[in-house]
């Protein structure tokens, strides 16, 4: 305890140098930790939403946009497709498709998408009703847990939809939706949607040419792997295409991976500089206090005790930097989560400590101790008489 007190006092005696070493390490650890937290949550949500969706059938355009719009609901759709033509794709034995889930949308309520679909869609994500029942009549709506929480909708609430996916000004006041059910939280895309029958979406847009025959996309489950090979050829003379979620998301990860790797490299560089700063801090402290250390030796302090003292100073610097870094990462995640929720309606607010973060903290503390151990080792070989005579 006495050594800990002395080590703390020694660090506080040089606040600028101590603060610099701590801040450098904190920012390095904070950046790496923030990337670990955000990547883990984004990956988990992407994998959860893509579960058992082998292919997505939709209008021709960008395959990635087709996936983002209809699986994750974070982009605009590529267009509409004929509902009967989509059902023919599912029912044709040549396509090797086992089943399909239709999605039709184009309206929103308070920027949350209203999606016309079948019961198989919430069943696919294991959605369970918290209150009420599933839709049975046109304009019945079942809302996701996040939608209910953010908008205040409850059983029996009525509202008008707005045209578009984010605009809330072009309101369809001739058709009234009624909330008949609320889903329990699923930690999937269902939480951020309002689900209704396809007929409700068609009814809102009645009068639009072919509105009652079109959907936005069909989520497909293949019967055999041959579907991946046969479908593109089957659709070549139509206005439809299929996209593979796994391939498109891997491509997206590769594109963002370059930026993530660059940020990770910068964070590691900052951490390296912090370890160098710890080395310099302990070395300069030892050099500036060589007379004090020599006196401690003459008063009975063993070389091992001096070594432990200097090592403890490096350990305190490292531990402080790691702890502050973890706090910085949580603050950064809070800001990032707010931005992501406002923009994409996705929740990244899990602040729990990851196993990989514990490993990062231990590794950073160990390297910090190692950086302090090198100059501290020099204290073991101090020439006491020479040091005192020079002073």
What is the predicted function of each stretch?
Residues 1-33, 246, 254, 311:
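N-terminal Sec/SRP start-transfer signal
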Residues 23, 261-281:
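Internal alpha-helical transmembrane segments of multipass membrane proteins
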Residues 108-119, 127-207:
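Hydrophobic secondary-structure segments that place a key small or acidic residue at a functional site
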Residues 270-273, 283-285, 290-337, 359, ...:
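Transmembrane alpha-helical interface segments in multi-pass membrane proteins
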Residues 328, 342-377, 386-391:
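Conserved transmembrane alpha-helices of multi-pass membrane proteins
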């Amino acid at each position: 305890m006495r050594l800990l007190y002395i080590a703390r006092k020694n660090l506080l005696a040089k606040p600028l140098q101590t603060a610099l070493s701590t801040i450098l390490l904190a920012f390095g650890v904070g950046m790496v930790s923030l990337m670990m937290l955000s990547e883990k949550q984004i990956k988990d949500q992407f994998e959860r939403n893509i579960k058992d969706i082998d292919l997505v059938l939709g209008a021709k355009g960008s395959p990635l946009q087709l996936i983002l719009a209809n699986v994750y609901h974070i982009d605009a759709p590529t267009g509409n497709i004929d509902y009967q033509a989509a059902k023919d794709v599912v029912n044709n034995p040549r396509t090797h498709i086992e089943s399909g889930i239709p999605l039709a949308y184009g309206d929103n309520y308070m920027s949350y998408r209203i999606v016309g679909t079948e019961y198989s869609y919430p069943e696919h994500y294991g959605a369970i009703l918290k209150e009420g029942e599933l839709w049975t009549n046109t304009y019945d709506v079942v809302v996701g847990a996040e939608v209910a929480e953010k908008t205040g909708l409850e059983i029996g609430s009525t509202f008008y939809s707005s045209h578009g996916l984010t605009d809330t000004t072009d309101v369809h006041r001739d058709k009234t939706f009624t909330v008949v059910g609320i889903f329990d939280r699923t930690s999937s895309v269902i939480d951020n949607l309002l689900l209704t029958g396809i007929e409700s979406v068609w009814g809102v847009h009645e009068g639009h040419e072919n509105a009652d025959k079109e959907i936005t996309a069909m989520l497909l489950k293949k019967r055999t792997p041959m579907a991946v090979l046969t479908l593109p050829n089957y659709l070549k003379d139509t206005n439809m295409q299929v996209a593979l979620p796994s391939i498109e998301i891997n491509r997206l990860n590769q594109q963002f991976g370059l930026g993530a790797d660059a940020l990770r490299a910068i964070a590691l560089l900052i951490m390296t500089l912090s370890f160098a700063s710890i080395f310099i801090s302990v070395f300069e402290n030892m050099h500036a206090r060589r007379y004090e250390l020599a006196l401690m030796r003459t008063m009975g302090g063993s070389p091992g005790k001096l070594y432990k003292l200097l090592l403890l100073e490096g350990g305190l610097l490292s531990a402080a930097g790691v702890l502050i870094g973890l706090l910085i990462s949580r603050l950064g995640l809070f800001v990032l989560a707010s931005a992501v929720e406002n923009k994409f309606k996705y929740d990244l607010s899990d602040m729990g400590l990851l196993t990989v973060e514990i490993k990062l903290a231990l590794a950073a503390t160990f390297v910090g101790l190692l950086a302090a151990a090198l100059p501290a080792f020099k204290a073991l070989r101090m020439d006491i008489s020479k040091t005192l005579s020079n002073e």
